[in-house]
Amino acid sequence: MFVRKTLLAALCATALLPLSAAYAADSQQFPSEQGSITATPVAKGLDHPWALAFLPDQQGFLVTELPGHLRFVSPDGKLSAPLKGVPQVWAKGQGGLLDVVLSPDFKQDRLVYLSYAEGGGEGGKAGTAVGRGRLAADLSGLEDFKVILRQEPKLSTGNHFGSRLAFDRDGYLFVTLGENNDRPTAQDLDKLQGKVVRIYPDGRVPDDNPFVGQPGVRPEIWSYGQRNPQGLALNPWSGTIWENEHGPRGGDEVNIIERGKNYGWPLATHGINYSLLPIPEAKGKTAEGTVAPHHVWEKSPGISGMAFYDGDRFNAWQHNLFVGALVSQELIRLQFEGDKVVHEERLLGELKARIRDVRQGPDGFLYVLTDEDDGVLYRVGLNQD
């Protein structure tokens, strides 16, 4: 078993990450229920950025771009050339280079994990892949990149890759896999479509996964019945894994992921088809043997990356969950009593930008990526008296 470690604790520095003076001049203030908030550009000129990770000791950031580039962003906002050693991606539709996370032991092993759309399927179709490589000391690229997980079969013609990555307290890697817009596969246990999987950091399957040893069932599966999971985060207080996913037309969900559970898609949904017709397989908003959403939006905001806030800088945000929204172009703040959502606030709508990812930085600020041709990495914080 792994030594329990918290990556942010290992990387944390209370000092502010330095910002470009030119970009700091572009800071904008917006209202919120808890006082005004400031959004300050850290970096501009990103090509549809998808995810970010914080390097230790205030070195800067790694940012993925959908067309297939991994970039180093210095603390003052300078973008590197695309890093070498990144796998070739299938950059069509929603496919491309997707999530990035650092190893829990990054200071020792320098391993960077990437998820991406990979071609090679029958009829030119694609699926999600996950791999890892060692970040070069000069930050110029990844070395010895190896694939540790492939979604099989590959069924996507451009949609629903999922692909979020998160480590739990014990060092297991959780990966969300979309159903490739092939609804019934989310219920098929011989396929990796519409699943959350749990693996060791090197791709091996833990013996205590729920379906290990069952004939015809993929042993990597931890949960199933997911549609297109776009957010994944470790709850820092309970240690549980939380996931969010796109509904069809309506029915975006937040779920607490439990071992071996069925989360319903497409048998249960709060949404309908984009054609305005019912989902053919759906039995209603609930179905026997499935887990109801922990939180649901009847009108889809198009949720994306999410992060729990457990920093010390902004006490008013403590125990809140922040969720990016692509369609409504906002940052959603969810407030809890225990695990129950009791309040929701919409933030940053004035930016009029698709928010693809949100992460809590080691300095206690939130960092937000906008999914645009000229994407921006923002630092977001409350203005405190």
Place the predicted regions along the sequence by residue.
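Bacterial N-terminal signal peptides that target proteins for export
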Residues: 1-10
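Bacterial N-terminal signal peptides
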Residues: 9-18
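Acidic, Gly/Ser/Thr-rich repeat motifs that build Ca2+-stabilized beta-propeller blades
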Residues: 23-183, 231-234, 239-247, 299-337, ...
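Blade/loop signatures of beta-propeller domains
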Residues: 23-38, 139-142, 204-214, 271-287, ...
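Beta-propeller fold detector
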Residues: 40-41, 80-87, 141-150, 203-211, ...
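Beta-propeller blade signature
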Residues: 129-138, 189-202, 257-258
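Mobile, glycine-enriched helix-loop/loop "lid" segments at the mouths of ligand-binding/catalytic clefts
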Residues: 197, 255-286
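Conserved blade-ending motifs and adjacent loop-strand segments that build the rim/top face
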Residues: 341-362
